[in-house]
């Protein structure tokens, strides 16, 4: 990587380490539908992937004219966690990449730490991650694309942000990284960004870090 030496790797979780996004989207679509807001699965992916959940719900309420109950997020989270615990799996290559990675690593997500940990345990990835290095946007009160959660993770690990490789899969995650002065490597069909390397599989990261 051009911005070497890299001293730590910060991974996004949903869609990067664990195949959780389709499950979460299904639960969100169903839960919104119970309260009169129609959201298609395709729109959930193309419009809202990686976006702050609070922002998404605020916009959907404004557009639909429907006011969601105060405990909506609790209802959604309960259904989401139950489905994830039953169904979530690791992304292809995630276990191998984490097993072979020789650098310190952390997981940084917009989701609560409880959800991050549940997904990693269910997908049998927690053995490769120190649970002290699970970082949530809820820790800092700012959500991607704001870089605050990545900066918080880097500081907590004692590593300068510019010496962290950041692995993301969403436009939202990519957008925040210039401000964080971190390197982004991502998987999936995303636009091209300067200084961003595209990964076809997580194991490709190991070659880039050599």
Put a short name on every predicted segment:
Residues 1-45, 63:
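Active-site neighborhood of HAD-like aspartate-dependent phosphohydrolases
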Residues 29-32, 52-66, 119:
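Helix-loop "lid/cap" segments that line or gate small-molecule binding pockets
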Residues 34-38, 64-68, 124-128, 158-159:
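Short helix-capping segments at alpha-helix termini
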Residues 38, 58-96:
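Metal-dependent phosphoesterase signature
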Residues 5, 82-107, 113, 117, ...:
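Short, acidic loop-to-helix structural element flanking the phosphoryl-transfer center
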Residues 1-7, 103, 112-210:
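Asp-based, Mg2+/Mn2+-dependent phosphohydrolase catalytic module
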Residues 23, 48-52, 76, 89-93, ...:
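Short beta->alpha linker loops
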């Amino acid at each position: 990587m051009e911005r070497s030496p890299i001293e730590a790797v910060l991974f996004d979780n949903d869609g990067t380490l664990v195949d959780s996004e389709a499950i979460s989207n299904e639960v969100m679509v169903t839960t919104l539908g119970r309260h009169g807001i129609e959201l298609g699965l395709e729109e959930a992916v193309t419009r809202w992937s990686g976006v702050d959940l609070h922002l998404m719900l605020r916009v959907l309420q404004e557009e639909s004219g429907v006011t969601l109950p105060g405990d909506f997020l609790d209802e959604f989270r309960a259904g989401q966690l139950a489905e994830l615990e039953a169904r979530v799996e690791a992304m292809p290559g995630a276990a191998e990449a984490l097993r072979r990675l020789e650098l310190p690593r952390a997981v940084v997500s917009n989701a609560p730490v409880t959800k991050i940990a549940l997904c990693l345990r269910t997908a049998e990835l927690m053995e490769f991650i120190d649970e002290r290095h699970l970082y949530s946007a809820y820790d800092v009160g700012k959500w991607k694309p704001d870089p605050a959660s990545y900066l918080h993770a880097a500081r907590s690990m004692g590593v300068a942000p510019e010496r962290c490789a950041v692995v993301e899969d969403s436009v939202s995650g990519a957008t925040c990284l210039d401000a964080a002065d971190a390197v982004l490597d991502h998987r999936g069909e995303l636009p091209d960004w300067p200084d961003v390397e595209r990964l076809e599989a997580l194991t490709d990261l190991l070659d880039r870090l050599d």
